[in-house]
Amino acid sequence: MSLMVISMACVGFFLLQGAWTHEGGQDKPLLSAWPSAVVPRGGHVTLLCRSRLGFTIFSLYKEDGVPVPELYNKIFWKSILMGPVTPAHAGTYRCRGSHPRSPIEWSAPSNPLVIVVTGLFGKPSLSAQPGPTVRTGENVTLSCSSRSSFDMYHLSREGRAHEPRLPAVPSVNGTFQADFPLGPATHGGTYTCFGSLHDSPYEWSDPSDPLLVSVTGNSSSSSSSPTEPSSKTGIRRHLHILIGTSVAIILFIILFFFLLHCCCSNKKNAAVMDQEPAGDRTVNREDSDDQDPQEVTYAQLDHCVFTQTKITSPSQRPKTPPTDTTMYMELPNAKPRSLSPAHKHHSQALRGSSRETTALSQNRVASSHVPAAGI
């Protein structure tokens, strides 16, 4: 039973470890931005810091870029409004949590959150190849280009937080361009793109004009996008988590039934061992009786002392009749024991033989007292 408890504890520990890791860690809060982490210059954004451990006091700090004086050692309750944003607000942020009873002790830092500020450069242009309207299953490529020497282009779709990025490549017409292949078109959507420089990766240009991609032959042409790597990655991650949890549950069930089978087998073996000695004793008694078929009870006869009588003549014999001499035999006391039928028959035969021997001896003694005629 102790092995079963240890196994259950191990399985529960690994499952909880996976769940906590998926949610951000055991003692780390979760930092997010609303409505989006991509904020236009002069706009506002709300940063939310949440925790499963009941933290109510949070501290926000910036890891890179230009420090923001109003955020230095800023203490807040669960959320903080940041803005109007400037290029100085662009960068990576983290938060820590604490309890009011122990404000000196802080939790581990949260997940990193990147705040992007847009509207710092001129906007690029976005186009679709072979066109903004395609058939279902047809390959679509979106091209983002500009005459500004951008180092990187970022593609954004309305309603999606993930922005794929590609380096800008000089083209023949003197522009800097990046092509985003979307694969076979299944659903449409509205797209924009941004440009940035290596020195300031979180400071983007103005967004391009929105481009609506339509897919013919599909009733929900504007409900979702063509096939994107981000959706595939999310599906795979959730699938891996589901498979791992299912395997852990199956292994736990197999281990449980195996331990149950072992316990039942041990109890059955113990019951059999308890019953074996009585049976062995019965068999041994029967064997002891059967293994001694030739046991015979013998009668031990003491040495008989015969009285020698002197033979006298008839004239010298007394007038009174002589006293008969009787011989006695003493048999040693023996404890009675139960005999088998064969033993009883053999003992009766011996006793009959003994009686005949005794009678013969008495006859011989009696004959010795008969007077000899003519002596």
UniProtKB/Swiss-Prot annotation:
InterPro entries reported in the protein's UniProt record: Ig-like_dom_sf, Ig-like_fold, Ig-like_Receptors_ImmuneReg, Ig_sub, Immunoglobulin_dom
Residue spans of biased composition, Polar residues class: 355-366
SUPFAM superfamilies on file: Immunoglobulin
Extracellular side: 22-238
GO BP, one annotated term: immune response-regulating signaling pathway
Membrane topology listed for this record: Single-pass type I membrane protein
Compartments it resides in: Cell membrane
Ranges for region Disordered: 213-233, 334-375
Biased composition (Low complexity): 219-231
Example of a GO cellular component annotation carried by this entry: plasma membrane
Keywords tagged on the record: Cell membrane, Disulfide bond, Glycoprotein, Immunoglobulin domain, Membrane, Receptor, Repeat, Signal, Transmembrane, Transmembrane helix
Signal peptide from the UniProt entry: 1-21
All copies of domain Ig-like C2-type, residue ranges: 42-102, 137-200
Glycosylated residue positions: 139, 173, 218
Pfam families per record: ig (PF00047)
Disulphide-bridged cysteine pairs: 49-95, 144-193
Ranges of the Cytoplasmic topological domain: 260-375
Transmembrane segments: 239-259
Primary role: Receptor on natural killer (NK) cells for HLA-C alleles. Inhibits the activity of NK cells thus preventing cell lysis.
Family: Belongs to the immunoglobulin superfamily.
Protein known as: Killer cell immunoglobulin-like receptor 2DL5A
Organism from which the protein derives: Homo sapiens (Human)
Gene name tied to this protein: KIR2DL5A
